[in-house]
Amino acid sequence: MSRPKHSKFRSIFLPPLTDASDRMQRRRVILKGISAAVGAGLSMPSLAQSTLPVVRIGYQKFNTLNILKETGYLEKALAPLGTKVEWREFLVTSLVTEAITAGALDIGHASDGIGVFQQAQGKGLAYLASESPYPEGVGFLVPSHSPIKSIRDLKGQKIAIGRGYNTHYLLTKALEANGMTNSDVDIVYIQLPSDHLAAYQAGKVAAVGLWDPFLAAAQVATDSRLLFDGTGFTGNRTYHFAQPNFAKAHRDVVKIIFTELEKANQWAQRYPNEVIDLFSRQLKIPPDVITLATKRRRYGLTALTPAIAREQQDLADVFLRLKLIPKAVDVKEAFLNLDVV
């Protein structure tokens, strides 16, 4: 496989923090953009008296909670309630949900699989809302010269994925759709995306499963071909979680958070070039990587629906069959519909 095209390729997988001047500059740009994007399209919810002095929000970069943080709009919206905002960044969203269950956070986002693991472990987290599906944001790459041309050609091949990751679910669904199971391939479980790429580039595996922005980074920086993505197999959703007692007790705060978050989503959908600029500067990765990821991403916040429950239930059932979770779960039992989206 050819060497990376970008000298900053490694930084894509280990993004550093940005400085204060960059944050202030981006905040001014986003504030103007969101004002133009939403106009009067979203009304503010009526504000009931809140007894919450601080709301603690956990987030990971490359997410719309991150965009919302940059604007400062949430702080202004919550000011009449006397509620301040404390933002806490996490490298992986599994730590976000762990912090919520431990009482160190009030609300945060995580991937679909993490929600299933938390429920199976009896953590008591509640799903509050979902982001729009992002099926093209997860996929499998093979070298451009590889003889592997279809999913069926993966039979007997070594494939790098993360155990219990979105790539694990996607691979399982794709194989089953082609009359195979995981036992028909040689799965190599790897935890970190940087290690995924190292094994792939060293030729130790025939294919690698990744998710954006790491998938886009690998597509840009290596001589690879996308074998398949999540289209038709997975929604690859992000969900927002909280402890149910917190969400019920502070529904006014939760509703304001989601109102402002949807404004950030609308802005991101309407102004992709600004999103590219924001994330490429913030993550310190080449703009063409974020451009590729942004083109296939649809931003939006949605209420929990029966269709979403069925989608998430299938993931839970697959993980049970793969013995990734210790017991069956009914996903609907963890859905908390408070009419906040």
Which role does the model predict for each range below?
Residues 1-25, 32, 36-40:
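N-terminal secretory signal peptides
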Residues 36, 46-47:
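Cleavable N-terminal signal peptides
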Residues 49-181, 187-190, 196, 206-212, ...:
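Short, glycine-/small- and polar/acidic-enriched structural segments
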Residues 113, 187-281:
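Pocket-lining segment of extracytoplasmic ligand-binding domains
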Residues 249-324:
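Secondary-structure end/capping motifs
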Residues 319-341:
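Conserved C-terminal helix/tail region of periplasmic/extracytoplasmic solute-binding proteins
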